[in-house]
Amino acid sequence: MSWTRVVVLSSLTTLLILTFSSVVKSAAVRDDSKAGDPKGAARHVFMPESDASNFFKHRSRRSPRYYSERQAEQRVRLSANERRREYNEEQRNEFENYVEEERDEQNERSREKNEQVREYHYDGLYPRYHWFH
């Protein structure tokens, strides 16, 4: 029970110190009247009413899109498809080259190994049918 009193008292004193300190005054929002022009700030944030109504009129769900907008979206889609196709083709070519090189190396290793085995087991009789005795 005593430790809760200590915690509560320390938090209350900290809160009291922070409310009356000068550091908090500088961090608080100022109430002076010489703040920036509110109309200028609103002008940067909001657009005129006519532009906003035109924007929503053109962008509503039911309004048809313009032909040029459709064409532009189609061009963007086609160019993205072309880039994806080229990238996939490049990746496929690189993989095919890698597989071909690996296959060639594997064939070379197995051929060398077969030649070594053949040389090791050769007993001087060359026609092949003499090998099996």
UniProtKB/Swiss-Prot annotation:
The modification 4-carboxyglutamate is found at residues 69, 73, 82, 86, 89-90, 94, 96, 100-102, 105, 108, 112, 115, 119. Residues 67-95, 106-116 have a biased composition (Basic and acidic residues). InterPro entries: UCMA (IPR031386). Residues 57-116 are annotated as: Disordered. GO terms for biological process: embryonic skeletal system development; regulation of osteoblast differentiation. GO terms for cellular component: extracellular matrix; extracellular region. It holds the Pfam family UCMA. Residues 88-121 form a coiled coil. Proteolytically cleaved by a furin-like convertase to generate a persistent C-terminal fragment found in almost the entire cartilage matrix, and affecting osteoblast differentiation. Sulfated on tyrosine residues. Residues 27-62 form a propeptide. Its main location: secreted. Belongs to the UCMA family. May be involved in the negative control of osteogenic differentiation of osteochondrogenic precursor cells in peripheral zones of fetal cartilage and at the cartilage-bone interface. This is Unique cartilage matrix-associated protein. It comes from Dicentrarchus labrax.
